[in-house]
Amino acid sequence: MRSTLRKDLIELFSQAGNEFISGQKISDALGCSRTAVWKHIEELRKEGYEVEAVRRKGYRLIKKPGKLSESEIRFGLKTEVMGQHLIYHDVLSSTQKTAHELANNNAPEGTLVVADKQTAGRGRMSRVWHSQEGNGVWMSLILRPDIPLQKTPQLTLLAAVAVVQGIEEAAGIQTDIKWPNDILINGKKTVGILTEMQAEEDRVRSVIIGIGINVNQQPNDFPDELKDIATSLSQAAGEKIDRAGVIQHILLCFEKRYRDYMTHGFTPIKLLWESYALGIGTNMRARTLNGTFYGKALGIDDEGVLLLETNEGIKKIYSADIELG
């Protein structure tokens, strides 16, 4: 079934609520035959949708699938660009790897790769990202910004702002940003963001932003080494969270912030990022490849670099593990 027809059919059922819709009404709305309507409904059933059919009444949607799917993500997605070209797989080694391959084959800006499970998910510095089936959001977004190479780190901070805003809209949960790419709830990691670039000489060909979100994990779902430092949206909310809704809200927030960025530059993003960031104005320890620095975090500069006031002066921190306090 074509994605647009599938989306339109699900929307018809959702608008009808508990009421039946006749096959003829669906046929007219979708612009296809009654036989085609039946085939489309069978496709939805294969995806896990429970559709009741009653003679002389028509069809009604009883239950949506519990698992993440392309249809669930597409339905209700209100973006113009981000996520409109969607690649969904139940299992991938890494959404980031697949997104790189797609970008190399001229995938358009806004292409989104989503997996229900990753077998080789990774975060910053090639660290393993625990991404089990059925509980999280594992996705990678392809961008093609016309910006200088040195400005690409700004997109990590833009993504962090969009994730914070999207989570609040989707689940009503307030989160904090820990420089440069971690989203925390009560000091525990909930989201990781990985930004990678494809470039030729001084030209950005594409930027791939990977986002991993712990959505419905419970404490026992985490490996022992993560139980004390990781949490999920569900644990914070005290209820199960709709993963498709989280994706949709984040994509919409990202699209708005990205449009602001391409129109007005980094300043609006910088101000938002600092308003959500932990530790600005307080002491922190930055562990870098060139040593460990301790000092007061002043904020970020116009390139998104962390400014740390130390006894030796202001240090620019480009990449580091941060310890607050």
Curated annotation (Swiss-Prot):
GO terms, biological process: protein modification process; regulation of DNA-templated transcription
Q: Reaction catalysed by this chain?
A: biotin + L-lysyl-[protein] + ATP = N(6)-biotinyl-L-lysyl-[protein] + AMP + diphosphate + H(+)
Question: What InterPro entries would the database entry show?
Answer: aa-tRNA-synth_II/BPL/LPL (IPR045864), Bifunct_BirA (IPR030855), Biotin_CoA_COase_ligase (IPR004408), Biotin_operon_repress_HTH (IPR004409), BPL_C (IPR003142), BPL_LPL_catalytic (IPR004143), HTH_11 (IPR013196), Transcriptional_repressor_C (IPR008988)
What are the GO MF terms of this UniProt record? Answer: ATP binding; biotin--[biotin carboxyl-carrier protein] ligase activity; DNA binding; transferase activity
- Keyword Iron-sulfur in the entry? The reply is no
Example of a GO cellular component annotation carried by this entry: cytoplasm
Q: Which UniProt keywords apply?
A: ATP-binding, Biotin, DNA-binding, Ligase, Nucleotide-binding, Repressor, Transcription, Transcription regulation
What are the BPL/LPL catalytic domain coordinates in residue numbering? Answer: 74-262
What's its job?
Acts both as a biotin--[acetyl-CoA-carboxylase] ligase and a repressor.
What the entry lists under HAMAP family is as follows: Bifunct_BirA
What is the protein's given name?
Bifunctional ligase/repressor BirA
Organism equals Bacillus subtilis (strain 168)
